[in-house]
Amino acid sequence: MRIGVLGYQGGVYEHVYMLRRTFDRLGVHGEAVVVKKPEDLKGLDGVIIPGGESTTIGILAKRLGVLEPLREQVLNGLPAMGTCAGAIILAGKVRDKVVGEKSQPLLGVMRVEVVRNFFGRQRESFEADLEIEGLDGRFRGVFIRSPAITAAESPARIISWLDYNGQRVGVAAVQGPLLATSFHPELTGDTRLHELWLRLVKR
């Protein structure tokens, strides 16, 4: 199994480390590689889009010729996991909490609506215990300038919710082999969400 991590920004090497731990836990012979160029997409069984700044990631991926071939591969069935900014990149519709509709380079492959900066800026970062469909027990979510998943249309569905300032919003969603999270599972040391996604990859 060969999993790529989009390598422009954010928790790239944290995801590589978590993948290696997850391969060991699942007893899978796997390789985690960093993706920066179109040729790095060859032979992948799945791809992770990490956190960071979604506009910057999208612009770099487009400028370096990765965005369009990656979109084509995902539409043809390549499993993908997006965390925080990565969830924005996967989303079909994106708004900003302050300025409204956003025009930015996206994959746009999941039928979800995401609101950028929903939980505030860096200084409003927080952690919360989450219930996630498919996981036993709670999962500690790390939210850093995180988006919220405010809507999902079939075949996408929200698998984790959070009550925030009196509003119930989605913080994780799946659509076939695609997984989007508002939070940063790579910062927790808990491999269960990576395990959940790799099981989708193996199907």
Curated annotation (Swiss-Prot):
Its EC number is 4.3.3.6, 3.5.1.2. InterPro entries: Class_I_gatase-like, PdxT/SNO, PdxT/SNO_CS. The active site is at 84 (nucleophile), 184 (charge relay system), 186 (charge relay system). L-glutamine binds at residues 52-54, 116, 144-145. Keywords: Glutamine amidotransferase, Hydrolase, Lyase, Pyridoxal phosphate. GO terms for molecular function: glutaminase activity; pyridoxal 5'-phosphate synthase (glutamine hydrolysing) activity. It catalyses: aldehydo-D-ribose 5-phosphate + D-glyceraldehyde 3-phosphate + L-glutamine = pyridoxal 5'-phosphate + L-glutamate + phosphate + 3 H2O + H(+); L-glutamine + H2O = L-glutamate + NH4(+). GO terms for cellular component: cytosol; glutaminase complex. Gene3D superfamilies: 3.40.50.880. One of its GO terms (biological process) is pyridoxine metabolic process. SUPFAM superfamilies: Class I glutamine amidotransferase-like (SSF52317). It holds the Pfam family SNO. It comes from the Archaea. Pathway: Cofactor biosynthesis; pyridoxal 5'-phosphate biosynthesis. Catalyzes the hydrolysis of glutamine to glutamate and ammonia as part of the biosynthesis of pyridoxal 5'-phosphate. The resulting ammonia molecule is channeled to the active site of PdxS. Belongs to the glutaminase PdxT/SNO family. In the presence of PdxS, forms a dodecamer of heterodimers. Only shows activity in the heterodimer. This is Pyridoxal 5'-phosphate synthase subunit PdxT. It comes from Aeropyrum pernix (strain ATCC 700893 / DSM 11879 / JCM 9820 / NBRC 100138 / K1). The lineage of its organism: Archaea, Thermoproteota, Thermoprotei, Desulfurococcales, Desulfurococcaceae. The gene is pdxT.
